[in-house]
Amino acid sequence: MMRSQGQISRIIGQNATAMTDITGFGIIGHLMKICRESGVGVTLSLDQVPILKGALDLTLIGVRSTLFEENVSQSFEVKYPKDNIKWPLLFDPQTSGGLLAAIPEKDVYLVTNELKKYGFMNEIIGEFFAGPPEIRVT
């Protein structure tokens, strides 16, 4: 983490319906928790998920964290393309990852523009849908 998440959480928090930092459960584990607690599903665009420099290279040579297998085994509600070389990164635990937030569609561009104004990297990585708690990775 290069910057404190205090300011970014205040900006996002004004409009978010759910927000968490990505830590030991990886982005998939935290997103699944939001889905379960909210009673919704989500379509996640794997190509929109930011990846740290060097992370994909490590994945390609088979480097995995000690929690990787456990995170994968607990994600039975996740449908992901196993032929995409990036999928293992979704289960990678972090000790201090970025923030993951659910923002109503009407507020998305307001929030993303405000984050850009202050120099915060941000991406729209998916969309929630009414339905059972599941993650569909595309």
Give the predicted meaning of each segment.
Residues M1-T138:
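Helix-biased detector of long, well-ordered alpha-helical tracts
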